[in-house]
Amino acid sequence: KVSLQELLSTPNNKSLLKRLGRENILSSKSEPGTQAIFFASAKSKPELFYLLWFYKDEAAYKKHVASANYKKFTSASAEILASKKAISLKKRATFSKNLTPERLKDAYFHITNLSLLAKSDAKFEKLVKKYMQKSVDEGAYAQFAFSQKDAPNKWVLVEIYKDEASFESYRHSENYKAYAKERAGLIDEFDGFGLKNETSFSKVKF
């Protein structure tokens, strides 16, 4: 089970949202069914945040959203958010390598929202799995691909690297060039941007 939220803080409340997010995430770490949480802010728009959760199953998700610390986070953050959007996702491909606290601390995240052309879903999933695994083998910390439950042609890709230089270096690799060439005939439009890690942890290998 996976959950994604896009949070936009009001202009003067970025620091408060970071603190509230951090408290909620650190409290959630002890929940057995919560596998990983990634909380990051957009580099070009620091008041825009993304919260990505991975749960063992639906029961673990329900337990988390019913918890006192999650309710506290929701009510406290409601007052300082300009907008909040929950995006319902289906996991399509996930690969990771050594997502330790030390590695995640200064990690560079990249999120891409894309729309596929009609009937490209299965082909794109195959393509993503092929190249994402290789990317993690070649140095990326993690590669996650999801489709939106209510719009299966809309996908969200989340990538984690050591830093922005590692991300740029991957973009010039033969693996990425081959992927970009193959996906060209499947994608209608896409938009990607960098994120800065705020508070993240992972207790599992994807």
Where are these regions (language model features)?
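Short S/T/G/P-rich N-terminal loop/turn motif that feeds into the first structured element of a domain
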Residues: K1-F49, K56-A66, K71, A78-F206
